[in-house]
Design a protein with these regions (language model features):
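Conserved GNAT acetyl-CoA-binding A-motif
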Residues: 120-123, 149-162
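Conserved active-site alpha-helix within GNAT-family acetyltransferase domains
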Residues: 140, 152-154, 163-180, 184-187
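Conserved beta-strand-loop-alpha-helix junction that forms the acyl-donor binding cleft
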Residues: 126-134, 158-167, 184-187, 195-196
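Conserved N-terminal entry element of GNAT/NAT acetyltransferase domains
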Residues: 1-18
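Conserved acetyl-CoA-binding loop-helix of GNAT-fold acetyltransferases
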Residues: 129, 135-148, 172
């Protein structure tokens, strides 16, 4: 994959944002945490787009969302000093997650924040590739594209992996697992940190 063909999704308008959200819905359809939050397929398809929009709003606004030129992969970054929209995220959780899981889901998000660096850093909030196009280097290309920005600025990076199958990809790009989080019936979640380069 030619990483020079990536561009910021936010600068091309609402149609590109909608396409990015749809790509993420397809990409996370088998993700352990996403499917723990929305177990039933119809509920996942109905509610996940709103969740991803809330998680990505600040990234889109900051022009820090990248997609592959074909739109099959998406990475949503938060630059240093740009915060996510916690209020919108909390509202989405309250309105879309079954009541029995809301406290655990909120606790998962809160605990992932505990491991974020206190120094200015880039935060990879979501990265996903459509299922039929995985294992072709798309995710790695998106990751490398974002990490080049981190390296140009000499900034660390943070993410949390919701799927243990993806931790090796992140490790190959310099991330280290710093903890394992599990709340109630949640699957394990792995906060990961990449030092300044």
């Amino acid at each position: 994959m030619d990483t020079t063909s990536l561009r910021a999704a936010a600068i091309v308008g609402e149609a590109e944002i909608n396409h990015a959200i749809a790509t993420l819905v397809l990409a996370f359809g088998t993700d352990p945490v996403a499917r723990w939050m929305y177990r039933e397929p119809d509920q996942y398809l109905l509610r996940a787009p709103r969740l991803f929009r809330a998680l990505g709003a600040s990234s889109f606004a900051a022009c820090a969302a990248q997609r592959t030129s074909d739109g099959l992969g998406v990475a949503l970054w938060l630059p240093p000093a740009v915060a996510g929209d916690d209020e919108s995220l909390e509202a989405v959780i309250a309105e879309s997650v079954v009541k029995e899981k809301q406290a655990d889901v909120g606790a998962v998000f809160e605990r992932t924040e505990r491991y974020r660096p206190t120094e200015p850093h880039w935060y990879l909030s979501l990265i996903g590739v459509e299922v039929l196009h995985r294992n072709k280097g798309c995710g790695a290309a998106l990751l490398e594209y974002g990490l080049r920005q981190c390296d140009r600025e000499h900034r660390p990076a943070y993410l949390w992996s919701s799927n243990p199958q993806n931790t090796s990809l992140y490790q190959r790009h310099g991330f280290e697992v710093v903890a394992t989080i599990q709340v109630g019936s949640s699957p394990p979640i792995f906060p990961m940190f990449r030092r300044t380069r």
